[in-house]
Regions:
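Extracytoplasmic catalytic/substrate-binding loops of multi-pass membrane glycan-assembly enzymes
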Residues: 34-49, 53-76, 393-397, 412, ...
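Juxtamembrane membrane-water interface segments immediately following transmembrane helices
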Residues: 41, 47, 212-385
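Aromatic- and kink-enriched transmembrane "portal" helix at the membrane-lumen/periplasm boundary
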Residues: 59-62, 78, 82, 115-141, ...
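Membrane-interface anchor segments at the N-terminal boundary of transmembrane helices
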Residues: 76-88, 387-482
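Transmembrane-helix motifs of polytopic, lipid-linked glycan transferases
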Residues: 83-106, 143-151, 452-455
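Transmembrane-helix signature of polytopic, membrane-embedded enzymes
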Residues: 96-124, 142, 162
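Membrane-interface transmembrane helices that cradle and orient dolichyl/undecaprenyl
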Residues: 146-163
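Membrane-interface alpha helices of multi-pass inner-membrane proteins
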Residues: 164-178, 219-227
Length: 532
């Protein structure tokens, strides 16, 4: 620190300490004070606060909550969770903007701007709450996604495989936290192709074709292997819950103390448990009706079965019953169709126009809930031997998968049309807001943002004097946005919180491209024009 006259001048190190200290305070204030100062629970939150093999729930967040329940108790753990999520978000956002500041030599005011833009994904439920104050996976995934972007940018900028390996590791973490983020394996595949093709190596230019082949083949293997590993991880997690008594008892002790007390008082050892299980089976054999009632809810399904079935059932028509030759499946389809049609969750009830996507998302999203018990009741009434079979879950899933795939094949054109109708709103979610009175204008603004960003990116790639890192940054954001929008619209049913991960990063990369354009061309031309 140097005192010059009456003014105190700070050196670079002191300025940086003061600057990053202010960012820490701003981040903690934003994540812990702004919005709600209480934990915010949603309908989905219950799926994470209990250790259960629930469809679509990945292992990381329930285990994270279980650890906090164990450390802080059921009365205080939610407050600990939102503090931990807030601190993690603060660390990740500051690391992200610091990476950009160091790479692009940003002014302090520019870094502040980038910091506030980076907060945008966390504000989808404002003014009620920040994402870090919610007991949902987004409390962790939005923050960790910035670490993914950091290592992915390093991989793209340096063309080094060690950074790519880091981005792949972050993808595994994110996919184990949120199932939809398996999409990022596709992004990693594209980045791998880019690195292989652009990496400087000794050899002839003709080897570019060989590199492209290696990149495509390697990217495909990475994508498929990643999805396979995550599926096995999820299956292992569910198997742990169902079969590992030590883990189940520990979870019961932490999450349900009353049930644990009952368990201890029962003094149930393995021999007694086996005797009671044998007695229960004998009772079921003697009382068929009792057996049916007990087994009706004993089924498991996968997220993929539900997605295929829901997307297909939304496209259903009454005459589609004739598509199924099997009498059991045909009867099941009729029962499912009647349930869905009664709730007006088919495509025929969707409004036309720009808001059609809302009815599509609502219909597809509710079909699974509407039809959850229909197969069980149908089997119990008409084919009770299926319910009593040890393969009940497998038979149920096979029938639902067959129905979903058959309907999608029969109405594939309509399915693509409805998917296409969801794309515009999905793209809007990635970079802009959906405002009812000016909804058409929202489409036009989004189109302008994407086209202008694409034009600026291409110009940077063409101009060899320009810093191509800005263009590579935008290419990563646009590419991941396109992959997310298409896959989520095709496979899942788009929700805003699935699509806003790159919201702030898009405007940051857009600003960097504009800055590069100004510094490289417009400013010099403006100076020459003034002199003239």
């Amino acid at each position: 620190m140097v005192e010059k006259g009456k003014r105190i001048q700070l050196n670079v190190v002191q300025k940086n300490r003061l600057f990053y200290g202010s960012l820490v305070l701003l981040a903690l204030f934003s994540f812990l004070v702004v919005g709600s100062r209480e934990p915010v629970l949603f309908d989905d939150s219950g799926a994470y606060t209990k250790i259960d093999p629930i469809e679509g729930v990945m292992p990381v967040y329930p285990l994270f909550l279980l650890l906090n329940q164990y450390l802080f108790g059921l009365d205080r753990y939610l407050y600990a969770v939102i503090v931990e999520q807030g601190i993690l978000a603060a660390v990740c956002v500051i690391l992200f903007v610091r990476t950009l500041k160091d790479e692009f030599h940003l002014h302090y005011w520019e870094t502040y701007l980038f910091f506030f833009l980076s907060l945008m994904p966390f504000t989808t439920e404002m003014p009620q709450s920040m994402a870090t104050q919610q007991i949902l996976t987004e409390g962790l995934s939005y923050a960790l996604f910035y670490l993914f972007v950091i290592v992915m940018l390093k991989a793209v900028w340096t063309k080094k495989y060690v950074w790519f390996a880091g981005s792949l590791a972050m993808t595994f973490v994110l996919a184990a936290l949120r199932s939809q983020l398996q999409i990022l394996f596709a992004v990693c595949s594209v980045i791998f192709l880019y690195i292989v093709c652009r990496r400087k190596q000794e050899g002839r230019k003709a080897c570019v074709w060989i590199r492209a082949f290696i990149g495509i083949a390697g990217g495909l293997c990475i994508c498929l292997a990643g999805i396979f590993v995550i599926s096995r991880l999820t299956a292992g997690y569910k198997n742990l819950i169902k079969t590992n008594e030590t883990f189940s008892v520990f979870a019961m002790k932490v999450q349900s103390p009353e049930d644990y007390e009952t368990y201890l008082l029962s003094g149930m050892d393995a021999e007694k448990a086996a005797e009671e299980e044998a007695a229960r089976k004998k009772e079921e054999e003697e009382d068929r009706e009792l057996a049916l009632k007990r087994r009706l809810s004993r089924f498991t399904t996968s997220q993929y079965v539900s997605l295929i079935f829901s997307r297909g059932m939304y496209e259903a028509d009454s005459e589609d019953a004739y598509l199924f030759e099997d009498e059991i499946v045909r009867g099941l389809y009729v029962a499912l169709y009647e349930a869905v049609d009664e709730e007006k969750q088919r495509y025929v009830y969707a409004q036309n126009g720009l808001w059609m996507w809302k009815d599509i998302v609502g219909g597809v999203g509710q079909v699974g809930k509407t039809c959850l018990r229909v197969p069980s009741l149908y089997y119990a009434e008409n084919y009770p031997e299926i319910v009593l079979s040890d393969q009940y879950s497998e038979i149920r899933n096979a029938h639902l998968t067959l129905i979903g795939i058959t309907l999608l094949k029969a109405h594939f054109g309509r399915f693509l049309y409805h998917t296409f109708m969801m794309l515009p709103q999905a793209f809007i979610c990635t970079v802009f807001f959906q405002v009812g009175p000016i909804y058409l204008l929202c489409h036009l603004v989004t189109l302008f943002l994407y086209l202008s960003a694409l034009a600026l990116m291409i110009r940077e790639f063409i101009d060899r004097k320009a810093d191509q890192k800005c263009a590579e940054f935008m290419a990563l954001i646009l590419g991941s946005n396109v992959v997310m929008v298409i896959v989520i619209s095709l496979v899942f049913f788009g929700q805003q919180r699935y699509l806003v991960y790159n919201f702030g990063a898009f405007y940051i990369s857009y600003y960097l491209l504009l800055r590069e354009l100004w510094n490289g061309h417009i400013r010099d031309k403006a100076r020459k024009w003034r002199k003239a």
